[in-house]
Structures are given as C-alpha cells and as structure tokens.
Amino acid sequence: DVMARTISGGQISLIIGVSAMLMALVVGTLVGAIAGYYGGGIDSVLMRFTEAVFNIPQLFLLIVIGKFFAMEISSIELFGRTFSGSVLVIIIIIGLTSWTYLARIVRSQYLSLKERDFISAARAIGTSNGPIIFRHILPNSMAPIIVAGTLGVASAILAEAYVSFLGLGVQPPTASWGNLLVSSYNYLQTAPWLWIFPGLLISLTVLSINFVGDGLRDALDPRTQI
C-alpha cells in the first residue's frame, strides 16, 4: 500500500534526521565549548581538527560506506522498531560529519560569554571549569544552537534521500522517502503517484523545518526584539 509505506518511510527519514542531528549537536557542542572556553593551544588544535572534518565530503563518504559496509551490519532495534543496519550507518556518518558548523557557533558564543561579569563572579567564588562550561555558559548559548540544530535536521533528511535514491542508503525492506523514490523510477509515467507523494513530502518537510528554524531565529534573537 503506497500510503502506508509513505507514512512508514517518513518515520524513518525523520528518525534519521533527528538522530543524526542530536549526535552532531553533542559532538559540536563539546568541541566548541572546550575550544572556546580554554582557548590557546587547545583551541588551535580543536579548530584545525574541525577544519579537517569539515573538508570530508559527506555525500561521498555516505556513498562509499553505504556501498561496502551497510549490508554487512545486522538489523537493529530502535524506538521499538526493527531497522536495517543501513539506517544506523547513515545516522552515524551524517552525525559525525555535520557537527563542524555547530562547533564554530558554540565556540564563538563561548569566546564572547566567558569574559562576561557573571562568569568572572563564578570564578571568584571558586566555581570549577566544568560547572562554568555546562551550567553557566551553555544555557546562555542555547538559542543559536537550537536554530542551527533545527536547520540541520532538514539537511540530514535531504542527505538520506539523496543516497537512498542512488540505492546506497536505507535498504529494503526498511522504507524511506529516498528508496521509495528509486523504487518508483521505472513507473514515472504509468504510476506517477508512486513518486509524487514521497517527493512532495520531502519538499514540504524540508520547507517546514526551514520555516521553523527561521521562526526560532527571529524569536530567540534579542536584536529582533529591540
């Protein structure tokens, strides 16, 4: 049934997008926070590492890993459902290659906030670096992190759809919007509904997430409230 598989494929695509971006948020926040707070040599090393990861082509890596390793991983249980191992591969690759811009955002926030008076007061009363990083500075840096993470979900969904359309992403019997599109390739004229609905939902989902991200940026940016 086309409707059932489209709905099921949407769940997979959204799970991949959200899970990959959560992984990217964790890695990017940790790297950016440590680099921005400590500065100096630590900052230089972490930023050079970030630049190296940034130069890794995400789609090329997804294609190569999907081609040679996705089928070797057994099915997994996630959120009460069974998925092919290719889902886990895509989540990990997207998550580990999408954190670089988040790290730069977090670093810039920490470089600015660590010199504020409330941080100086926390140091004066003997607060250690860990609580300052995660309890004092991080909550004040959440607005741009939330916005960047929201927009990153849309990018992750598009990346999954791209590699799945090439037949190297999510593998059957697990459905995703990307492999629904490739399965309808031979029926473009005779059964257009097979590709119209997955393609339309990908477009609407990505547009909706981008609108949410823009709205969050406007709502959380204090400069727009002046």
Which positions does each model-derived feature cover?
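Generic hydrophobic transmembrane alpha-helix motif, especially the helices
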Residues: M23-V27, Y37, I42, L46-Y110, ...
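Glycine-rich helix-loop "coupling/hinge" segments at transmembrane-helix boundaries
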Residues: I65-F69, R81-T82, I94, L151-L201, ...
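Hydrophobic alpha-helical transmembrane segments
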Residues: L14, V18, L61, L88-I92, ...
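Transmembrane alpha-helix signature in integral membrane proteins
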Residues: A4-Y37, T205
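Hydrophobic alpha-helical segments of membrane proteins
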Residues: V18, L22, V26, L30, ...
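Short cytosolic juxtamembrane segments of multi-pass membrane proteins
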Residues: F211-I226
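Alpha-helical transmembrane segments of multi-pass membrane proteins
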Residues: A4-I16, A20, T50-F54, L111-S112, ...
